[in-house]
Amino acid sequence: FWLSETPDVPSKGWDAVLPRICSWGHFKCKDTGFEFLFFNLHMDHIGKKARVESAFLVQDKMKELGKGKELPAILTGDFNVDQTHQSYDAFVSKGVLCDSYEKAGFRYAINGTFNNFDPNSFTESRIDHIFVSPSFQVKRYGVLTDTYRSIVGKGEKKQANDCPEEIDIKTYQARTPSDH
């Protein structure tokens, strides 16, 4: 669905500079019957209202797409804001979602996820988030900055503006590598 006032129609939302979407899936474990929803998005980098309204839209869609079952959900993506911004609060303030960083029993995160294309930078700013329903137990959380130094070929270094994150949720393991 589109992160806009008209989520069923390709569109830019609110004050967004670019059209943005949220992809989702409904999953069911064959062995246990456990069901959950998984969402991934890339929020606008400029539109403040778009980010806040998108946060509320995604949470409304979680309820709608669960078809009355109140299924647990995982939401990943590049949110283009860190843990100090209003749109981050919009995700965690309703009690529908928790930040896996905050919920984790163990954190391997010596750096945040935003590096502005500088592999030597240090930041506590986390713009890539993994949010989970309160029913999930998050055992470990990691920001894997070692990927900055991966050899791509002939001595070239891999460049990225965000760090991959990895969490282990109960018996499920999720890895969200950043695409940029």
What is each of the regions a protein language model found here?
Residues 1, 40-44, 76-80, 102-104:
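Active-site-proximal beta-strand/loop segments in catalytic clefts of secreted hydrolases
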Residues 6, 40, 166-168:
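Short glycine/proline-rich turn/loop motifs
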Residues 14, 47, 173:
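Generic anion/oxyanion-binding catalytic loop in active/binding sites
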Residues 1-35, 140-144:
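Structured beta-strand-rich core segments of catalytic domains in phosphoester-bond hydrolases
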Residues 62-73, 81-180:
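Metal-dependent phosphoester-hydrolase catalytic domains
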Residues 19-39, 49-91:
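His/acidic metal-ligating clusters that form di-metal
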Residues 6, 46-48, 147-151:
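A short local loop/turn or secondary-structure capping micro-motif enriched for an aromatic residue
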